[in-house]
Amino acid sequence: MADSDSSSEMPAHSPSPSPIPCAKQKPPNTGITISLLEIGSLPTFCCSSFSEPNNNMCPIRKQGKVQKFSNLLKDVKDVLKNIAGFEEKTTDGDPFDDTYIPEDLSELNIRGFDKRNKLRFKDDLFIHFDPERENTMRQEMLFKSHSAKNMVQKFARDLCNSEEKRGCDGVQLNAKRRRTGSVHIRGEYRKLRNNMEQLLQEADHWSKQHNELSELMRSYQECHKEIKDIVDCSRVCSQTQNNNEVPSKQKLEEQVKKLSQDTHSLHLIAALLENECQILQQRVDILRELHLHEAGPGHEKPLQTSGEQDKKCGEQDKKCGEQDKKCGEQDKKCPKLAEAEKMDGSKHTMKTTEGTITRKPKIFRCPNDCLTKKARNNRFNARVAKKSLVGKRRTISSFR
C-alpha cells in the first residue's frame, strides 16, 4: 500500500527503458556476506512530502514508475536471499577457516551499508526521477554485480587455498603426532610392563602369605577342638562327681545315724552293767554277812556291820529320793515319756526281782533285814533304769 501511494504522488517524466533484464541477471556465485538493504513498508512521511506538486501527473507515467520500483524491490529481495543461503553454507563449514568472518564485524558492516542504502533510497524518493540518474543507477548495479562476482571468486580461491593449507598442516601434524605418539606409547608400554611385573611379584607374596594364614587357621582350629574336648571331659567328670557325691553324702548321713544309735545303745548297756555290778556288790556283801552269822558265835559284829549297811542304804535312799523328785519334774513336762519310762521301769524291776528271788538264800535268821535289803535293791534298780531312760532321751534330742 505504501508503494502504491508513493508512486501515485510522484511527478511525471518521460518513460525510460525498464531495468528488468539487467537487474534480473543473477551472479553465478552469490556468496557475499554483506547485505544491501532491508526491505519493508515505506515510511509515511514519503507519502505526505509529495502530495501537492504532483496532482497534474499522468496516470500512464505513474504506472510505469510503480512497475520500476516493484522490479527493483524484487531484485533486491532475490539478492538478499542468495546472500542468506551463502552465509548458511559458510557457517556450516569449519569456524577456523581463513575465510571465516566473526559475527560482530559482519553485523557492523551490515549496519553501515543499511544506513547508506536507506539514505540513498530516501534521496531517490525526494528528488524527481531523471533518466541520467537511472543510468547511473544501472551502472552502479552492474559494477556491484561485477564486484560481487570478483569477491565470490576471491572467496572461492581463498577457500581452496585455506583448505589446501589446512590439509598440509593436518598431514604434518599427523606425522608429528605419530612420531611423538610412538615415543609416548613406548614409554607407556614400558611403564605397563613394569607395573605388571610388580603386580605379579605382589601376587606371589600375597599367595605365600595366604598359605601361611591358612596353616595358622588350621592350627588354631585344631587347638580350639582340643580345648573343646578338654572342657567337655571336665564337664562330664564334674557331673559324674556331683552325681556320685549325692549318694556318698546320703551314705555318710546313714552311717552317722547308725553310729549315734550304736553309741546310745552302748550308753544304755554301760548303765545296765553298772547297775548289775552294784547289785552284785550288794549280794556279795549280803553273802559275807550270812557267812559271818553262820560261822561266828558272837552276834555283835554282824549287827554292827548291818547298822553300817543300814546307814549306807539310808544315804542311798536320800540320793534316790532327790533323783526321783528331779525325774518327777521332768515327767510333768513330758507325760508320754514318763509313762513309757514307768512301763520300762516296772518291767525291769520285775526282771530284777525275779532274778533276785531265784538267787536269794532260803534260810535267814532275821527276815526283816532281808526284806528291807530286797526292797532297797528293787528301788535302786528302778532308779537306775529311770536314769538310763532319761539319758537315752537326752541323747536322742541332742542328735536331732
Curated annotation (Swiss-Prot):
User: What's a BP term from Gene Ontology annotated to this protein?
Assistant: positive regulation of transcription by RNA polymerase II
Q: According to its UniProt record, where is this protein located? A: Cytoplasm; Nucleus
Q: Name one GO cellular component term.
A: nucleus
Chain residue ranges for the region called Helix-loop-helix motif: 116-127
Per UniProt, the keywords (alphabetical) are:
Coiled coil, Cytoplasm, DNA-binding, Nucleus, Phosphoprotein, Transcription, Transcription regulation
Per the record, which residues fall in region Leucine-zipper? 252-273
Q: Where is this region: Disordered?
A: 1-27, 295-332
Cross-referenced InterPro entries, in alphabetical order? Answer: Spz1
The Phosphoserine modification is found at S106, S207
Q: What's the main place this protein lives?
A: cytoplasm
Which positions are tagged coiled coil?
182-231, 268-293
Q: Which GO terms describe its molecular function?
A: DNA-binding transcription factor activity, RNA polymerase II-specific; E-box binding
Q: Enumerate the residue ranges of region (Basic motif).
A: 128-193
Post-translation changes: Phosphorylated by MAPK1/ERK2 and MAPK3/ERK1.
* Functional note: Transcription factor that binds to the DNA sequence 5'-CANNTG-3'(E box) and the G-box motif. May play an important role in the regulation of cell proliferation and differentiation during spermatogenesis.
**What else is noted?**
The helix-loop-helix and basic motifs form a SPZ1 specific bHLH different from the classical one.
Q: How does it assemble?
A: Interacts with PPP1CC isoform gamma-2.
Q: What is this protein called?
A: Spermatogenic leucine zipper protein 1
Task: Record the organism.
Answer: Rattus norvegicus (Rat)
Q: Per UniProt, what is the name of the gene that codes for the protein in this document? A: Spz1
